[in-house]
């Protein structure tokens, strides 16, 4: 992903593709959690000016820890509820829940309860969610594109 989610459509995707990157996870909201692309499944970006698909896969970012802790100012308990609703919405629609978690949330004084939030969310989700790598999501997406055209 691009740091601070700094992104320029479609230029960033072109640059990433030229650098050999297979996928990106920058397309999300910094100030609120949710589905910036309308859903959370893989997609192949499209350059409207050149009228062509770009050679990179976008895995839209659904939620980021800092968004809930800083921008939305949610206490840790409410963040768990919010993550769970977003995960459920992603699963229901067949998407992937891309979560960005920073190591700075280890600071219990600055972000009380947030490290526990991540652990709770991961362990609670383990019974229902399937945890996969971005590489696997890309492989499955490309396979579907080949078989469905």
Where on the chain are the PLM-derived regions?
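C-terminal domain-boundary segment and adjacent tail
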Residues: 31, 41, 77-149
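Active-site-adjacent pocket scaffolds in enzyme catalytic domains
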Residues: 1-90
